């Protein structure tokens, strides 16, 4: 039986999100956010771009309602448009945190799911050679979509002096932790081919006085001094490797030092984005991955106490334990 009054709200919402995505892609192709870091009329923008003024007005109005552009009315009744703070920081080519256009090409989620249906999970072995410059830069952009921001916002490092960031990769977590906590100094430990990117970012963000880098892995790492915090972000999908890593991390810590464990889990929160994250990760490896309890149990089993949840969002949890 057909109920014609049953509206396809969920379907329409998804299709409308896709429209917003396409609008965002067009605005990036035009480099609008760099051009309107200062207020500009649609007419002036039309002249510089060679694009129809009315089209640009409608585009800017759509971007204004999305929250990426601010409209300012002048005393003469005309409108000027300026990039909103979030667009200036992440979508302007002049920003250090510019996300680039690659993030906004056709996403890999569809390709990933299609490949899983046709071929099953990837059997690729993640060895040290996997961690190329390209992969590290890709993870850097992904981290800027919320991972770094939420970690810096929710992880409390007040009073801590020395942070060890194992597998710190691009280095953004340590760079911005030390920017928030001026007395904190960080040491990033990662593979030799990865730290090329790490050092570039340390220089880019002028963090050389706060962040050091060591080439190597945690198996052979022999620090001369203890740390009072260790940060681990998605460093391993293996339960055995996780326990080994936590055991080693404990030896690197001074008494009452803390380990901060940030990881994807299949039961982070009950929102749609966590469900999407879980689906993607299963399609990538054919394994369900960690649950929250796996992390807290691993922390307790390796001698950490005061195990607490710090933050949960979009398939990720941050938990903390004390030596």
Residue ranges and their predicted role:
Residues 243-255:
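A short glycine-rich, Lys/Arg-flanked "PGG" loop and its adjoining helix->strand segment in the class I
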Residues 1-111:
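N-terminal accessory segments
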Residues 159-169:
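Conserved class I S-adenosyl-L-methionine
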Residues 228-242:
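A short SAM/SAH-binding and catalytic strip from SAM-dependent methyltransferases
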Residues 170-182:
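Conserved SAM-binding loop of SAM-dependent methyltransferases across substrates and taxa
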Residues 219-230:
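A short acidic, Gly/Pro-enriched loop at the edge of an enzyme's catalytic core
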Residues 256-264:
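Conserved beta-strand signature within the Rossmann-like core of class I S-adenosyl-L-methionine
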Residues 266-285:
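Short, glycine-/aromatic-enriched active-site segment of Class I SAM-dependent methyltransferases
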């Amino acid at each position: 039986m057909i109920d014609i009054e049953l509206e396809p709200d969920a379907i329409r919402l998804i299709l409308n999100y896709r429209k917003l995505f396409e609008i965002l892609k067009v605005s990036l192709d035009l480099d609008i956010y760099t051009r309107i870091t200062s207020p500009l009329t649609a007419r002036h923008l039309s002249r510089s771009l060679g694009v129809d003024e009315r089209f640009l007005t409608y585009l800017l109005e759509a971007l204004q309602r999305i929250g990426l552009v601010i409209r300012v009315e002048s005393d003469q009744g005309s409108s000027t448009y300026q990039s909103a703070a979030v667009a200036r920081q992440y979508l302007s080519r002049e920003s250090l945190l510019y996300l680039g256009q690659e993030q906004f090409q056709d996403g890999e989620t569809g390709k990933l799911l299609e490949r899983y249906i046709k071929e099953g999970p990837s059997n690729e072995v993640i060895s040290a050679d996997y961690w190329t410059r390209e992969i590290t830069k890709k993870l850097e952009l992904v981290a800027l979509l919320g991972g770094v921001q939420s970690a810096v916002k929710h992880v409390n490092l007040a009073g801590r002096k020395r942070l060890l960031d194992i597998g710190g990769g691009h280095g953004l977590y340590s760079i911005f932790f030390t920017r928030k906590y001026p007395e904190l100094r960080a040491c990033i430990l990662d593979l030799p081919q990865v730290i090329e990117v790490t050092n570039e970012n340390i220089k880019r963000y002028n963090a050389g006085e706060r962040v050091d880098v060591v080439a190597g892995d945690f198996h052979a790492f022999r620090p001369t001094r203890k740390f009072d915090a260790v940060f681990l972000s998605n460093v391993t999908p293996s339960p055995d490797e996780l326990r080994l890593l936590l055991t080693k991390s404990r030896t690197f810590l001074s008494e009452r030092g803390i380990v901060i464990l940030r990881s994807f889990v299949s039961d982070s929160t009950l929102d749609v984005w966590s469900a999407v994250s879980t689906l993607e990760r299963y399609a990538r490896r054919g394994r369900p991955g960690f649950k929250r309890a796996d992390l807290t149990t691993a922390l307790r089993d390796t001698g950490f106490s005061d195990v607490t949840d710090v933050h949960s969002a979009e398939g990720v949890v941050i938990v903390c334990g004390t030596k």
